[in-house]
Amino acid sequence: MAPGARISLLLLITFTLLGPQRSGAFPAMPLSSLFANAVLRAQHLHQLVADTYKEFERTYIPEAQRHSIQSTQTAFCFSETIPAPTGKDEAQQRSDVELLRFSLLLIQSWLSPVQFLSRVFTNSLVFGTSDRVYEKLRDLEEGIQALMQELEDGSSRGGLVLKTTYDKFDTNLRSDEALLKNYGLLSCFKKDLHKAETYLRVMKCRRFVESSCAF
């Protein structure tokens, strides 16, 4: 065989072997790694939003008013209108596929509102991280979708739809009404991320028994 023909054949074999690895957005990963990555993303994002909530509260909400405001914030959380588990015990009664669908629904309900987050919070080190929230939210969405593809054998099935979505964050921080609105939205965002994190940790723990299951 001529040298040129041998080189062409070698290149053809090389590209054939590399082709399947480059066909997807992410390389194939074990299910345990997919769960571990999703849990870490959810934990980090939940903590980031919790810190932002605390900083917003400290900066804009008088301490004497916090309790009365917090007691009425549940009305802002549209996620309460879906039959999602409210805690670890309830989550353990649901299948993994159900929990993934609830998690995805909660995450996707915030993709639009959080795009305005960085325009609202610009004067603090904590608020300065808010421009990363959308990116991290999309990363978590992709992680959950990857898990759903694995558990549903790659099929795409319809799920629940949140009929009422969250409003965008208000950029007018000089208005008391806007401050209360943003405070309520941050509270709901924090609660919804806590739910999603809980669901992912429940699934990971019952599939891969480990010491961190106590939470």
Curated annotation (Swiss-Prot):
Name this protein carries in UniProt: Somatotropin
Keyword entries, A-Z: Disulfide bond, Hormone, Metal-binding, Phosphoprotein, Secreted, Signal, Zinc
Pfam families xref list: Hormone_1
Cysteine disulfide links: 77-188, 205-213
Transmembrane regions listed in the UniProt entry: none
Chief place of localization: secreted
Localization (cell): Secreted
Segment forming the signal sequence: 1-25
Protein function: Plays an important role in growth control. Its major role in stimulating body growth is to stimulate the liver and other tissues to secrete IGF1. It stimulates both the differentiation and proliferation of myoblasts. It also stimulates amino acid uptake and protein synthesis in muscle and other tissues.
SUPFAM superfamilies in the record: 4-helical cytokines (SSF47266)
GO biological process, one term: response to nutrient levels
GO molecular function, a single term: metal ion binding
Species name: Trichosurus vulpecula
Binding site for Zn(2+): 44, 197
Family designation: Belongs to the somatotropin/prolactin family.
Recorded GO CC terms: extracellular space
Keyword Transport included in the entry's annotation: no
In-chain residues carrying the UniProt-annotated modification Phosphoserine: 130
